[in-house]
């Protein structure tokens, strides 16, 4: 049984940067609170907790004088409230998310209605919507635009950073088809994360060459679920968070296994899965 990892695996640039910032802050101050989970990966959060990093869900739950913003970012109203309380803010927002926030603000300042291709319940998308100044919506269904009777003639379109590129392309085409009948002006910003795009391409290429594909990452991680959906189109694929979730009956008749991971999956977790597979292979 041969095991091969995708060429793009482990922490992405944005997560690696956020963790470095948080580890440094926690080390210097003996701990720090984050507004929302830094990343959607429980193993990483457990390790950070051991360093004195505490997750708070609401601003009112902050007990210290320093708070970290997660890699998913926040909207301007949240930033203003944090500043009004005199809190020192440690911003770990991913630069690619920041770019999407800037695009939304640019649309808003130009008088454009912002349409985000993304999950309206995801913290990243909530933050981006905030920068649209309340003049926007998020949806994964382009037909949702039909529900807005007085849709602006001026429409700006962008994407949640972790979405699948082909999905965003299809979404944009559908929005254009709907908007042109309204004599609209449309602006499109490519806000997809380059790392995620490369990771998806590498995973898809590997999935086409193996009998079984394993995606390692948090079950509530958007970019990890997208990898799962993508790999499933070409190979038998399962999502696992740790080696303990791997089921041996998946391996029956399998000679080649491919491994990829979500952008917030750490090297230790990946190594544990690979080691477990090696032990199973040696005992076969």
Swiss-Prot record:
It catalyses: isopentenyl diphosphate + 2 oxidized [2Fe-2S]-[ferredoxin] + H2O = (2E)-4-hydroxy-3-methylbut-2-enyl diphosphate + 2 reduced [2Fe-2S]-[ferredoxin] + 2 H(+); dimethylallyl diphosphate + 2 oxidized [2Fe-2S]-[ferredoxin] + H2O = (2E)-4-hydroxy-3-methylbut-2-enyl diphosphate + 2 reduced [2Fe-2S]-[ferredoxin] + 2 H(+). InterPro entries: LytB/IspH (IPR003451). Pathway: Isoprenoid biosynthesis; dimethylallyl diphosphate biosynthesis; dimethylallyl diphosphate from (2E)-4-hydroxy-3-methylbutenyl diphosphate: step 1/1; Isoprenoid biosynthesis; isopentenyl diphosphate biosynthesis via DXP pathway; isopentenyl diphosphate from 1-deoxy-D-xylulose 5-phosphate: step 6/6. Binds 1 [4Fe-4S] cluster per subunit. Isopentenyl diphosphate binds at residues 40, 72, 122, 221, 223, 264. Catalyzes the conversion of 1-hydroxy-2-methyl-2-(E)-butenyl 4-diphosphate (HMBPP) into a mixture of isopentenyl diphosphate (IPP) and dimethylallyl diphosphate (DMAPP). Acts in the terminal step of the DOXP/MEP pathway for isoprenoid precursor biosynthesis. Its EC number is 1.17.7.4. Its cofactor is [4Fe-4S] cluster. [4Fe-4S] cluster binds at residues 12, 94, 193. PANTHER family: 4-HYDROXY-3-METHYLBUT-2-ENYL DIPHOSPHATE REDUCTASE. It comes from the Bacteria. (2E)-4-hydroxy-3-methylbut-2-enyl diphosphate binds at residues 40, 72, 122, 161, 221, 223, 264. Dimethylallyl diphosphate binds at residues 40, 72, 122, 221, 223, 264. One of its GO terms (biological process) is isopentenyl diphosphate biosynthetic process, methylerythritol 4-phosphate pathway. The active site is at 124 (proton donor). Belongs to the IspH family. Pfam families: LYTB. Keywords: 4Fe-4S, Iron, Iron-sulfur, Isoprene biosynthesis, Metal-binding, Oxidoreductase. This is 4-hydroxy-3-methylbut-2-enyl diphosphate reductase. GO terms for molecular function: 4 iron, 4 sulfur cluster binding; 4-hydroxy-3-methylbut-2-enyl diphosphate reductase activity; metal ion binding. It is an enzyme of class 1 (oxidoreductase).
């Amino acid at each position: 049984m041969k095991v091969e990892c995708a060429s793009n695996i482990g922490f992405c640039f944005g997560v690696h940067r956020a963790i470095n910032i948080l580890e440094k802050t926690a080390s210097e101050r003996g701990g720090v609170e984050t507004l929302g989970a830094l990343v959607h990966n429980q193993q990483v959060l457990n390790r950070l907790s051991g360093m004195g990093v505490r997750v708070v869900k609401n601003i009112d739950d902050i007990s210290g004088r320093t708070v970290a913003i997660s890699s998913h970012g926040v909207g301007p109203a949240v930033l203003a409230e944090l500043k009004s309380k005199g809190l020192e803010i440690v911003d770990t927002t991913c630069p690619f998310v920041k770019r999407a926030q800037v695009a939304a603000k640019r649309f808003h300042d130009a008088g454009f209605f912002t349409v985000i291709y993304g999950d309206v319940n995801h913290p990243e998308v909530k933050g981006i919507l905030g920068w649209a100044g309340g003049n926007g919506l998020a949806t994964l269904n382009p037909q949702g635009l039909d529900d807005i009777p007085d849709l602006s003639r001026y429409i700006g379109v962008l994407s949640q950073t972790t979405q699948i590129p082909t999905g965003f392309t299809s979404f944009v085409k559908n929005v254009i088809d709907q908007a042109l009948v309204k004599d609209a002006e449309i602006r499109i910003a490519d806000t997809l994360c380059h790392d995620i795009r490369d990771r998806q391409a590498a995973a898809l290429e590997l999935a086409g060459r193996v009998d079984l594909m394993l995606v390692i990452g948090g079950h509530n991680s958007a970019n990890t679920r997208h990898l799962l959906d993508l790999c499933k189109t070409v190979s038998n694929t399962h999502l696992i968070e740790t080696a303990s979730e791997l089921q041996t009956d998946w391996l029956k008749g399998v000679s080649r296994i491919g491994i990829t991971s979500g952008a917030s999956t750490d090297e230790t977790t990946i190594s544990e899965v690979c080691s477990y597979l090696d032990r199973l292979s040696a005992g076969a």
